[in-house]
């Protein structure tokens, strides 16, 4: 047997089948960084229409989690797709660097402020800590393939940012939106005043720990016949008169415990510990209730004639107690915030000396700590006390009197939602914004309608100061307040917030020093981050005053979306964004949120290290982010399978462009019909993909690409052209036509993929266009001539067999469509039936390869007419050695009818060829051996090996 391998055009490419993403991606990341790719993109796109996606600042604390990855990757996909569409789309990352979590972490290392570390050193350490966290998180984000201005992020701790926040506060004050109100603080009943954090020390104290029943009024959700009570645990019985709600943890599940006469509702994770403390026999129910199911239910106060709601709060302890706490907004920081969030009454029943006001039922005139015994007695009388025990624990004390202190509501600074019509203007601006998904508009409308005034002051150390001077007697602001804002902001821009805290009051107001108090409160960190429109969008020249898009998790309707909107309206009466897009939370396969306590966390770092960032990116893009986003090892495995399908498709096309350059491009009109068809199909898909990028529907894009790879390419076109690619002459018009099609398809597809599979797309681009710059410096591939009048609905065929259910528009489109393309669509409908028949014969060991088969097609006259157009090339379309056409009336009994809703009167019979196999093309043909010089070849191969080469027209 002769070896004809050298006469074949075998595929070859450097693009490997094995992705090895975890290792390979790092090389591309390094190249992007070394080439300063982000700067190249900015330079190239300068002057183009702008699209500004404004990054919500991530909190600079701890490792990034899967939710962070989802958020940043979605943003990256949008920015990259906008660049492809011809926009200048800068992406400036941001970090939120002030606030309590950073303070707590610094305290863990250095101790309490004012005790172990002075306040100025403490702030310096907070800056240092934030810097380190930003560096770590930035590296993790870059590893995900996110292109951004990582060298120039915006940080809320930057001196310029802090100064501009002070300037922004000045504008809000000037516009009449700020007033002084109330909030709970540490309170010493001996001093009769609030205490600063530095004036508080912790000592052991014996407290009365009690478990108390709150009977649930609306218990239909449980579908039980006995009463149900939620059990709270508290160490401050005296606060129960101020109760306004019961809080459950947002991430905990709850179960019913049958104690005989009634059910107790307890946290599933704490139920065993709780009932062991109660020392009672119970039956624990199997059904679990999520806290969100219970939110809003009403419960009966244990001894007052009032009902209060069940709410959610992340401050509920998850390692002790019952998983439920009672909420007294006047007596606790978290309780107060919960009260604001849920618009609860905030009434303080206790005077400055810690005595209940006389009008307080059952307890009037009693000192709070002595009233504990009275509260416990009342609970016993009302049969609502489940457990009482004494507990020794660390408790805050006054540093002067060494006595226990309490939380008591006191004055704070607020932004009024009513003054100067702020709420109305905010609502008006909401109507001008495009909210995605559409139902999120209603969500933020309700939140704005129901929200209380915004408490912007905090009694902490690490944050932007409220730079106000207040008259000691009248409470009025200094008459030169606006001028002082300018002066103080200029100082802070040079020295940071320390300029305010270190300075003497006299430095700013001179002789008025004795008449005014300097405010030492800091701003709520949401005010910090919410002012990024004023500090970043308005200031950085590559951005714009109003962002085209804000994109964050759905929780930010209550957070950054709202703080940005309110602060922007408070300054200039306009929303800071044109569009707002929200994504859901990431949950595990059981629909549970990721949390350490549940042990169900899947970290992005682990995914990247194991399977690569592109797999993570593909999962994110393929998931409908408008709801909860489910992730698991199995789901990631499916993403990896999808990735392999895409990679193998791209590899096949690259390998079959071996020896092809742009000089070999064939004009569209001169291409073979099948090649024109697939290019036109690709163009149509590209139109839909670009539209889906524009509307942020990425899961449709992934679905389209997967279907295209599996059905149009891998399941049809690529299989058909293998024969032409391998067996025709190297420079034959037929082969160059197919390579031209592959070139156009790959050029389009690599761009479709680049916002999602960023590393892989760069790898493809290096193979496809090694002398060109990065794929991220390209725009959509529109260079190929548009092929018009093409209908691709595989289920609609023009002719007598058209189903009656198709629309007139579809019918007219078919009549205008290219006739040969309709014939190709017919082939696509018939092909699966032929493949199934061949596969059955394979299993029965009648056939080996599909080229051992010959096919007889029995069809009506219209189908026969259309398939006849392919002539001898019809066999290539069905990847068999021969195809014969017959009238439908001639079909034998063993014929298999094509199962199609619209293509009628078509049946097939597959038989094994009786002819010899050509050793070069593997077709079984009658003419094998007819040439004395090439006895093992068919005439077609003889022509390709030792002649002018075969001529193809269709396939």
Curated annotation (Swiss-Prot):
Taxonomic superkingdom: Bacteria
Uppermost EC category: ligase
Sites where the protein binds Zn(2+): 918, 921, 938, 941
Matching PANTHER family: ISOLEUCINE--TRNA LIGASE, MITOCHONDRIAL (PTHR42765:SF1), SOLEUCYL-TRNA SYNTHETASE (PTHR42765)
Gene: ileS
Localization terms from the record: Cytoplasm
Organism expressing this protein natively: Vesicomyosocius okutanii subsp. Calyptogena okutanii (strain HA)
Name of this protein: Isoleucine--tRNA ligase
Binding annotation for L-isoleucyl-5'-AMP: 552
Chief site of localization: cytoplasm
């Amino acid at each position: 047997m002769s070896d004809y391998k050298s006469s074949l055009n075998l595929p070859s490419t450097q693009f490997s089948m094995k992705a090895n993403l975890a290792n390979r991606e790092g090389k591309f990341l390094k190249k992007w960084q070394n080439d300063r790719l982000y700067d190249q993109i900015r330079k190239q796109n300068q002057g183009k229409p702008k699209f500004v996606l404004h990054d919500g600042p991530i909190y600079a604390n701890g490792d990034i989690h899967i939710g962070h990855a989802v958020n940043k990757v979605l943003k990256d996909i949008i920015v990259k797709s906008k660049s492809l569409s011809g926009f200048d789309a800068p992406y400036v990352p941001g970090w939120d660097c002030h606030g309590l979590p950073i303070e707590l972490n610094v305290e863990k290392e250095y101790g309490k402020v004012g005790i172990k570390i002075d306040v100025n050193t403490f702030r310096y350490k907070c800056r240092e800590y934030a810097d380190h966290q930003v560096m770590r998180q930035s590296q993790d984000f870059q590893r995900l393939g996110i292109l951004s201005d990582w060298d120039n992020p915006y940080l809320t701790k930057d001196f310029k940012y802090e100064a501009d926040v002070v300037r922004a506060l000045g504008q809000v004050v000037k516009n009449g939106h700020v007033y002084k109100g109330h909030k709970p603080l540490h309170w010493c009943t001996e001093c009769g005043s609030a205490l600063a954090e530095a004036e508080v020390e912790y000592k052991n104290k014996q407290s009365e720990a009690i478990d108390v029943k709150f009977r649930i009024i609306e218990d239909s959700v449980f579908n039980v016949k006995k009463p149900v009570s939620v059990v709270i645990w508290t160490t401050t019985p005296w606060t129960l008169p101020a109760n306004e709600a019961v809080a459950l943890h947002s991430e905990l599940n709850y179960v019913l415990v049958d104690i005989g006469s009634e059910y107790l509702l307890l946290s599933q994770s704490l139920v065993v510990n709780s009932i062991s403390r109660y020392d009672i026999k119970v039956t624990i129910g199997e059904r679990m209730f999520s806290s969100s199911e219970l939110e809003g239910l009403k419960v009966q106060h244990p001894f007052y004639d009032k009902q209060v709601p069940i709410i959610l709060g992340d401050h509920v302890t998850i390692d002790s107690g019952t998983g439920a706490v009672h909420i007294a907004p006047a007596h606790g920081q978290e309780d107060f915030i919960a009260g604001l969030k849920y618009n609860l009454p905030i009434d303080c029943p206790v005077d400055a000396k810690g005595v209940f006001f006389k009008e307080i039922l059952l307890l009037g005139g009693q000192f709070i700590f002595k009233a504990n015994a009275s509260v416990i007695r009342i609970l016993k009388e009302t049969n609502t006390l489940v457990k009482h025990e004494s507990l020794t624990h660390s408790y805050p004390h006054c540093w002067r009197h060494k006595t226990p202190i309490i939380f008591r509501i006191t004055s704070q600074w607020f932004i009024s939602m009513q003054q100067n019509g702020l709420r109305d203007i905010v609502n008006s601006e909401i109507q001008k914004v495009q909210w995605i998904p559409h139902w999120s508009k209603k969500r933020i409308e309700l939140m704005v309608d129901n929200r209380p005034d915004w408490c912007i002051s905090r009694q902490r150390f690490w944050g932007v100061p409220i730079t106000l001077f207040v008259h000691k007697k009248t409470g009025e602001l200094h008459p030169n307040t606006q001028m002082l804002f300018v002066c103080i902001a200029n100082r802070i821009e040079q020295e940071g917030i320390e300029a305010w805290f270190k300075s003497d009051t006299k430095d700013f107001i001179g002789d008025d020093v004795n008449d005014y108090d300097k405010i030492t409160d800091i701003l709520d960190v949401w005010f910090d981050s919410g002012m990024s429109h004023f500090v970043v969008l308005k200031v950085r020249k590559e951005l714009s005053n109003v962002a085209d898009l804000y994109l964050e998790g759905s929780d930010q309707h209550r957070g950054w979306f709202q703080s940005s909107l309110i602060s922007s309206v408070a300054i200039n009466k306009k929303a800071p964004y044109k569009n707002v897009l929200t994504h859901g939370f990431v949950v595990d396969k059981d629909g549970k949120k990721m949390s350490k306590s549940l042990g169900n966390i899947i970290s992005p770092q682990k995914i990247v290290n194991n399977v690569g960032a592109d797999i993570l990116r593909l999962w994110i893009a393929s998931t409908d982010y408008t709801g909860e986003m489910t992730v698991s090892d199995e789901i990631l495995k499916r993403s990896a399978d999808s990735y392999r399908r895409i990679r193998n498709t791209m590899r096949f096309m690259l390998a079959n462009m071996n020896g092809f350059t742009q000089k070999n491009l064939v004009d569209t009109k001169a291409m073979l019909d099948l090649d024109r068809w697939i290019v036109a199909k690709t163009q149509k898909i590209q139109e839909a993909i670009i539209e889906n990028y524009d509307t942020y529907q990425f899961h449709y894009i992934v679905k389209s690409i997967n279907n295209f790879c599996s059905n149009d390419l891998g399941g049809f076109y690529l299989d058909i052209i293998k024969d032409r690619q391998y067996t025709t002459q190297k420079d034959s018009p037929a082969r160059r036509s197919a390579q031209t099609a592959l070139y156009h398809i790959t050029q389009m597809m690599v761009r479709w993929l680049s916002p999602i599979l960023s590393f892989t797309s760069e790898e493809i681009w290096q193979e496809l266009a090694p002398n060109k710059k990065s794929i991220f410096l390209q725009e959509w591939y529109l260079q190929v001539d548009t092929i018009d009048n093409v209908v691709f609905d595989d289920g609609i065929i023009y002719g007598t067999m058209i189903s009656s259910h198709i629309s007139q528009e579809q019918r007219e489109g078919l009549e205008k469509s290219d006739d040969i393309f309709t014939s190709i669509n017919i082939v696509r409908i018939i092909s699966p039936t032929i493949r199934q028949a061949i596969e059955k014969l394979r299993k029965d060991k009648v056939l080996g390869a599909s080229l051992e088969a010959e096919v007889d097609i029995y069809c009506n006259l219209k189908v026969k007419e259309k398939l006849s157009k392919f002539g001898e090339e019809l066999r290539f379309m069905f990847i068999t050695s021969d195809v014969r056409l017959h009238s439908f009336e001639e079909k034998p009994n063993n014929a298999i009818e094509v199962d199609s809703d619209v293509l009628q009167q078509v049946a097939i019979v597959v038989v094994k060829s009786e002819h010899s196999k050509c050793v070069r093309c593997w077709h079984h043909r009658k003419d094998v051996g007819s040439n004395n010089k090439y006895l093992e070849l068919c005439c077609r191969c003889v022509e390709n090996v030792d002649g002018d080469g075969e001529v193809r027209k269709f396939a």
